[in-house]
């Protein structure tokens, strides 16, 4: 069955065709470049932090090389290329794959005659459009990966350049101006039928629930730029002055010095995929994992010129501190749980083991039964006197893909998923967080949010889009059978249910009470998962191998009362 459809086969969304001469500025010359050769080429390397020179030496370009890649036939191998998925199918694809591609192409948004992205949902049955007719940066990532894997990189190129253009806009919420490097949460194409001109309207958080700026958008943009570069072998886009400046602006926001004593990023609730009040304020695992991955991607993409060299050095320093902090204080397994259970409190000195003064009585009862003897995960949040022990899927999957998790920790996360399959996978992969909060805690944490009731939406709902992240993590850890089992579950329901945004219930059995149908990232997430499972070399565009220069986590002795 032929999956690849040329650009001429793309279907336009009638209200999203676009044209605007004045919005392009000097980026128009980049957009109008001839199509690159899609044939996969040798790409650049995951550079070790030990290669970073602090002596002032360097060179003007990024470095070439190979990435270590998982091979089903035997351990690690080098990624030479990622051919279009449709070219090397070893077996007949599932019947719903064709429907998925058709639905994905229906969601395409066009600007100036060129495909620019995909809208969040193409649900004609819904009376309220809300913001589901916009192109969200985080939502487009699985769509972009699907097109890259299918040999259609121009869509991704246009998206990267247009969002870069939007980054340069003045950004205000009420009378307050946002940082120059902030990327939009989403944008919309507005068509003026009388003038025949289309314009872009970006949202930097001023229209979002709670008016929170998206911290993750800039990280996803850098990660996607690397994926594009890995997939095509084309370094010219990343090395343009515009892309180099865009990365530096994003990094300036998150590498700036302040009052923090931690290398993690302090964030407000609702700043990421969980975009409503869910108690993730502070130092959420999702943001820290994306931050880590974006730093490692930027380390590969930044030039070692006068402007880039300073950032390369700052990134290397931050990565060392961040990896140690996350692996030491966010990691939880059976032994660490037992240690925390026996912690002393009120320790004043540099020798304190309970550095955050976590009260053992604050450990929730559910955790003792949930934690298996074999397995572990990165908890949701760590800050003074507070540990959020909930499981968050996206942060843990990104931790594996970015190698924030050590190989042993990555294996333990997979062990946990297998041991707690009913809780984390159920009947529809994958729980966005576990467990759900309810009753009085729900009222306090969510502010009585009617959308985030227990086992619904972000409060323990099941999100099919996470399937691509699970599959990538499974392939990287050599456990593709877990992904195959999860995909089999999803294929039983997704098309029949109309590609819902999320599922409700403890097992993920019911279509979400407010879930949009034909949710684009549910569709794209499934396609990416299928293509990666059929051709694991695709993993190279979204996975980073472990950097040996990062020191392993130091074993800490437990603190307890005799």
UniProtKB/Swiss-Prot annotation:
| A cellular component term, taken from the record's GO annotations | cytosol
Q: Name one GO molecular function term.
A: sucrose alpha-glucosidase activity
Gene3D superfamilies (UniProt xref)? 1.50.10.10
Q: Which reaction does it catalyse?
A: Hydrolysis of terminal non-reducing beta-D-fructofuranoside residues in beta-D-fructofuranosides
**Where is the protein localized?**
Cytoplasm, Cytosol
| Main localization category | cytoplasm
Task: Give GO terms for biological process.
Answer: lateral root formation; pollen development; primary root development; regulation of timing of transition from vegetative to reproductive phase; sucrose catabolic process
**What sections of the sequence does the record tag as coiled-coil?**
none
Q: What is its EC number?
A: 3.2.1.26
Which keywords, in A-to-Z order, does the entry hold? Carbohydrate metabolism, Cytoplasm, Glycosidase, Hydrolase
Name the enzyme's class: hydrolase
Task: Name the source's superkingdom.
Answer: Eukaryota
InterPro entries attached to this UniProt entry: 6-hairpin_glycosidase_sf (IPR008928), 6hp_glycosidase-like_sf (IPR012341), Glyco_hydro_100 (IPR024746)
Pfam families in the record, alphabetically? Glyco_hydro_100
**PANTHER family in the record:** CYTOSOLIC INVERTASE 1 (PTHR31916:SF59), PTHR31916
- Family statement drawn from the similarity comment of this UniProt entry: Belongs to the glycosyl hydrolase 100 family.
Function text: Cytosolic invertase that cleaves sucrose into glucose and fructose and is involved in the regulation of primary root elongation, lateral root formation, floral transition and pollen development.
| Name used for this protein in its record | Cytosolic invertase 1
Question: Where does this protein come from, organism-wise?
Answer: Oryza sativa subsp. japonica
- Give the source lineage, highest ranks first: Eukaryota, Viridiplantae, Streptophyta, Embryophyta, Tracheophyta
